[in-house]
């Protein structure tokens, strides 16, 4: 225990977490700090430098804790599961304050890494106009798992169906819940997580990628809502994770995953200040058929911004052709480049090109594109 000091003081300090990829400690952003001494309690949040100053003064050294309830509007569950937010009790220390460096492999490292990636994602949303995930987002971190998911089950009000021998248990197994399937299935919706993050064996950089992937799904949910997500979940239940690219709602799933995977990788590269302009997508195709390469190319070649792509992920966009049609509708002057981003990556749109107003251009492309009878709605 650190020595007491005379007089009332407002405790302050800095909380950092170790980035084992960069080899340095980085601030833990926006997390709640709680101080108490018997019946006196005080809370505040760290700033973007990881620094905090308590609102209340203490004459004697209080007990310090980090509570993973972030000022941006999300909670992280961990050691207490759905009962309470994850927290790190730091013990009794001086009333001058207490600082903590959270090392890789230590008790709270996973929570701090997930916290920072989520904080940065919310900040990106504020800067770009991409919708944030739904309010009061619940993220449950599992330190021994390697899989993650964004089921959003507590927010889905539409029926979820499945075909064949699939069931809720199969669904949970398919997205990595394993032996917890039965327990989670019986929990009330209000205590189900929106997102699960598996951090087992992951570096800080990998956690950053995975968290941004899942949060991109949550932003997608904010725009399309329950009915769309029920179809997404039904596909997972029926075909097992991503399936093989066939079956009902396969392209709906493919669109969601091309957005999620590419956003995870793009955000990760931006955080580490690595340009993707001259970097061909090198992560492979999830399940062999999903093509994050499309969104990656649209961004790295500055054809469309992340926000412009996001604006096309609306209700009714549940096939590749409908996605292309929406992009053509919004950005007709980029139609040729948009088409190329798809065809270069193995997806051939069957959508008519828009009339750009350029007679020479339109005349040249009239016979190039296969006409489509599909009507976008």
Residue ranges and their predicted role:
Residues 10-39:
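Short, ordered, surface-exposed loop/turn motifs in non-cytosolic proteins
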Residues 27, 53-63:
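Short Pro-Gly-centered beta-turn/loop motif in secreted/extracellular proteins
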Residues 37-53:
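Short, acidic Ser/Thr/Gly-rich low-complexity loop/linker segments typical of extracellular
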Residues 55-57, 72, 98-168:
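Zn2+-dependent metallopeptidase catalytic core
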Residues 194-211, 251:
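Short pre-active-site segment immediately N-terminal to the catalytic Zn-binding motif
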Residues 209-226, 257-261, 265:
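Active-site recognition of the HExxH zinc-binding catalytic motif
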Residues 222-252:
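Post-HEXXH active-site segment of zinc metalloproteases
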Residues 276-377:
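Pan-zinc metallopeptidase signature
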């Amino acid at each position: 225990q650190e020595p007491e000091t005379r007089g009332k003081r407002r405790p302050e300090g800095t909380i950092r977490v170790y980035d084992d990829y960069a080899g340095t400690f980085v601030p833990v952003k926006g997390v709640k700090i709680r101080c108490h001494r018997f019946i006196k309690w005080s809370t505040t949040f760290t700033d973007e430098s990881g620094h905090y100053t308590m609102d209340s003064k203490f004459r004697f050294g209080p007990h310090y804790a980090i509570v993973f309830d972030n000022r941006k509007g999300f909670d992280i569950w961990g050691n207490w599961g759905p009962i309470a937010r994850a927290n790190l009790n730091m013990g009794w220390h001086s009333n001058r304050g207490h600082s903590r460096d959270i090392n890789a492999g230590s008790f709270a490292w996973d929570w701090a890494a997930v916290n920072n990636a989520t904080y940065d994602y919310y900040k990106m949303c504020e800067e770009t106009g991409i919708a944030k995930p739904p309010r009061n987002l619940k993220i449950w971190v599992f330190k021994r798992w390697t899989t993650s998911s964004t089921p959003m089950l507590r927010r889905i009000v539409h029926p979820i169906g499945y075909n064949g021998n699939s069931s809720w248990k199969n669904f949970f197994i398919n997205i990595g819940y394993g032996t917890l399937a039965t327990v989670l299935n019986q929990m009330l919706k209000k205590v189900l997580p929106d997102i699960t993050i598996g951090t087992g064996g992951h570096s800080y950089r990998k956690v950053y990628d995975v968290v941004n992937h899942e949060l991109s799904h949550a932003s997608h949910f904010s725009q399309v809502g329950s009915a769309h997500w029920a179809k997404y979940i039904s596909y997972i239940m029926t075909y097992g994770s991503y399936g093989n690219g066939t079956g009902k709602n396969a392209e709906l799933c493919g669109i969601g995953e091309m957005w999620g995977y590419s956003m995870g990788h793009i955000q990760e590269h931006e955080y580490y200040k690595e340009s993707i302009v001259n970097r061909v997508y090198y992560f492979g195709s999830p399940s062999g058929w999903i093509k994050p390469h499309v969104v990656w190319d649209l961004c790295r070649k500055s054809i469309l911004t992340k926000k412009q792509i996001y604006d096309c992920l609306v209700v009714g966009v549940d096939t590749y052709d409908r996605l292309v049609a929406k992009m053509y509708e919004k950005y007709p002057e980029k139609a040729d480049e948009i088409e190329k981003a798809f065809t270069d990556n193995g997806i051939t749109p069957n959508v008519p090109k828009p009339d750009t107003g350029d007679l020479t251009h339109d005349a040249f492309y009239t016979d190039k594109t296969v006409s489509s009878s599909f009507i976008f709605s």
